[in-house]
């Protein structure tokens, strides 16, 4: 019995330690991208600037990082609006500067440019409209320490 316990202890020391969030932070520093889970199984992927403030946020149905099966990827417009309003309250966006709608078949993309942020939403607009029809939404902050946004490049 003593030999068995000794072997078990020796074997357990040889196993690699789990990679926790804190272990990875200690080894590599603060992440520049993180993912959070909002209500209704919606994922928020956030890219940070060098100052640690959010620069870009992608809102989409949460999926495993490595996935072989397509998960239902649509969200209700109400849920997406609620999350966007939490992340960027209307009073902080600044005045609306420009808006654009792209439509191809059933796919529709709407981008609104404000003084401080761009907000883009992509939906399946096939009739009859489904309750869950938004595939992604993107919030891009216009800050000096953020990478140049693809939206900024489109509006030069």
Predicted regions and their residues:
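N-terminal targeting/docking segments
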Residues: 1-2, 11, 99, 138
